[in-house]
């Protein structure tokens, strides 16, 4: 899948730990996701900036006023944004997954090529 590649661990490469999360969906299926513990990332070292799209208060106020004047109804929805397919610009290293350590490559770490859940770069 090309999400990461195994590389030798050097003394100057900081690694991030990861964990699995498991969810039972409403249709009875199970879903597993690999999360990186991105809360250990330090701004200015591991990433430059983050962005969270937020609407201006005046824009929301205008939208609600216009909706009320037109006697329209509003429905709410949640849009989850995770940029998992974007190529990483920074070099980020993750420890190998517990229980999935590559045989004969125990001293290597995963260099992330794409974002994973939990990374600051994942949105």
Locations of regions flagged by a protein language model:
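Long, low-complexity, charge-biased intrinsically disordered regions
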Residues: 1-123
């Amino acid at each position: 899948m090309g999400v990461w590649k195994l590389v030798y661990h050097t003394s100057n490469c900081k690694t991030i730990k990861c964990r699995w999360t498991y969810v039972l969906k409403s249709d009875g299926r199970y879903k597993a996701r690999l999360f990186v513990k991105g809360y250990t990332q330090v701004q200015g070292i591991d990433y430059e900036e983050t962005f969270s799209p937020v609407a201006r208060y005046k824009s929301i106020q205008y939208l609600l006023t216009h909706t009320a004047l037109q006697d329209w109804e509003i429905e709410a929805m949640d849009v989850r944004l995770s940029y998992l397919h974007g190529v990483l610009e920074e070099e980020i290293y993750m420890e190998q997954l517990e229980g999935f350590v590559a045989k004969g490559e125990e001293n290597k770490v995963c260099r992330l090529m794409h974002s994973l859940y939990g990374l600051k770069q994942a949105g």
